Amino acid sequence: MKRRTLLKAMSSLGVIPALSYPALSRGIVDGGHEGPLLLQIHAEGGWDVTSYCDPKVNQPGERPITTWSETLDPVRVGGVEFAPFANNEWFVEKYHQQMLVINGVDLQTNSHTTGILHNWSGRNAAGYPALTALFAAHYAPTAPMAYVNFGGFGSTENLISYTKLQGDPAGIAEIVEPNLQGRVIDNPVYEDGHPVYFRQPAELSLIEAHRQARLQRLQARGQLAPREAANLQAFSEATRARGPLKDFADYLPKAEAIFPQDEITHNNLKAQVQVASSAFAAGVACAADVQMGGFDTHDDHDALHKPLVQLLNESIDLIWTLAETAGYADRLTVVVGSDFSRTPEYNSQQGKDHWPIGSVMVMQKAPSWGSRVVGLTDERQNAIAIDPVSLQADPSSGAIIYPKDVHEQLRQLLGLADSPLAARFPFNSGSGFRFFGDLS
């Protein structure tokens, strides 16, 4: 979809304010990625799943686990149950058919560092890549920005390089098109303004020709040291990516369309989503990590958690709105998770501390496995062993869900299970879980 059409649709949906739209529109960049896409959202700090996708109500004789359950019951829509907290009811009603909730995931730690590592690599020791890195290396190893990371866990284990970004489309545009000095409104053909360059395109073409000739001479020299040869090859690949990246600048939202930092939570998650969506729409990226902080609520838990959950849900809604509008929703998988969860009771500061049993949410457009919850926890949020095939409680001979089990199933879902790259990082859990049903 062309950028002009995309922005008009966004405005009509109320996603962004009304804008002036550039006439210089184009489709996906030449040779852009048109295959599967993966976006992961990290709720940094440890989210409280008892007020989200694994709702818990207070039990007689026990300390309160949630304050909302003093007057309300969990909200069930289809096969999914959420807490009636923040804007959860709106969110689950709109998206339950697109989601699978995996509860009772044992992160085996109360450490932020280990929890992040475990949740996003599938292992609680260093040495395994982020799922997004593996995905990008498998599906789009030569894309200019195949793997985009806005923070959080981003280990690549040398499978691929990542592009580190912030949620600042204006700044990114300056980087990907550094020769653009500005625009002058002097021609009705250019609604965005006539481009003014530091150097004219003809001059840059001449400089580029000389650069390529010199690079070829260097690469043709005999007896290059391995590091020197690798550096020259990396430079050659980087220069080839400049053309698509220049085109990518046309997909980025204009300054007045960029979501500002959230005033309550001080997160710019929506702006991160806008940049990631632009990269997906342009075909220059196939995997992205976005993150929001603030979930480490050791005091005043409910008051601090509520706006965070609301922003998270709104941002997921924005992801799917942009994906539908740009026409790539049927290629997108979204995974949402956190370091771990929070304790099944409040502390003396009305906060909640760290708890290892958490959840993961997976979303696609119209999946066969949607509107379901797998994994079990008891009334005090302890993990319950389940039968890997029936997914029913089996305390005597069942298995607890660990991040490695989630990653094994995600690899199956995403077509990575038989990848030679994935074979370098096996889990071999032997648990045989089938969260998504028969994927053969």
Predicted segments with their positions:
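Ligand-binding pockets and gating/stacking loops
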Residues: K2-S440
